[in-house]
């Protein structure tokens, strides 16, 4: 009724008003409800849409029903698939192996934004990590642009822009490498605090770090390390990163060399480092980071004071926690001793670059958008796998790739689409050889991310929307919805 009030008011003021209605109708809730009532998801969804349409029309709301869009209909998701192909051609849709969030109850992966306090946003079930080959959109390629363009939104609430800033999470720091003589290898770390590099007393690896496999070769501690990694991988991200969670780890028996000091540093596998942020390895500086302090306390690892308050000495025996203040002076830091910490940051990065073991780097908390779902009720991903040609896009004139109806919804972790022989088996559009289709579907947010554009040109069967028509109506003046 709020939207209807605004639309009627603007019409009476002489504005051309676009006030449409549509149905974001793919996704797990509809699929689960259909399964529960033993009815096909399409039938269940369209019957509910018809009922809600009847109710809205009975209320007399001033929607332009001629512009109605329904994301689960073929005339809409054809264009969602078309967008996927456009992104693929431009190198922005990629398939890669990744540790993903997995919900055993929903039998599907979840994007980071769909995990709330370590639980599935739909069913509240605990989420675990699982290695799968998945499709991603490379939104990280646009991280700087997304951040910079927040300044072009002067009317947006500050709390929303702050959320976006934190979600993108831009930071500047140093990436540098520690040699591992026993393995003839190196391990790289990323830090925003290069001024603490002289205080490194251990190396903390994420349980998913690929170096662990090499560390475990002919290592008497391999069973202990692998068991620990398996346990940690099943912990939620919230559980692992919470400041209140117990910091745990296993010493690997292997050492690396701090390039700044030449000192041997123990390599540990820990539960508080995440592989998908930075490099998946963190330099442990107990006196400069509270998590490292707690970890060093638990395992009796050496602590070295490298930063003191200006004009004041910090004695290790008198410290009860890490010194994390933003002002200070370096001590026990070689040629940088006595330097103010912010000046030292730049000077230490200069040294790493000059000596060839490190480089300045910009890092982001933002991750690529995981769009694969092992569910039925979503837009099929228009990819064919050929033994000769590899990944092949479904030709544009063959879109949409339609959802099959002869599927099983009790396939466990297997996508329901994989149970349809007729859907899976096809011919390669390039060479004509026997091939198979991608059986994952797209995240429902893919369909709902562009419907506002389709409203402007809802009956166009030649393209998703006409640019000139969209420019006439856009951008959206008022949107009523959640903070996301």
List the predicted regions and their residue ranges.
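Conserved active-site neighborhood of enzyme catalytic/cofactor-binding cores
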Residues: 1-6, 11-18, 119-121, 254, ...
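A short acidic-Thr-Gly-centered motif at the start of a beta-strand
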Residues: 175-183, 257-259, 275, 431-434
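Pocket-edge structural micro-motifs
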Residues: 21, 139, 178-180, 191, ...
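N-terminal cofactor/phosphate-binding cores enriched in small/glycine residues
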Residues: 1-44, 50-54
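A short small-residue
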Residues: 28-34, 61-64, 473-476
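A general alpha-helix detector
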Residues: 29-33, 145, 211
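Structured ligand/cofactor/substrate-binding pocket environments in proteins
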Residues: 1-7, 24, 71-81, 95-96, ...
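Residue patterns forming the tRNA-binding/recognition surfaces of aminoacyl-tRNA synthetases
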Residues: 36-187, 194, 281-400, 409, ...
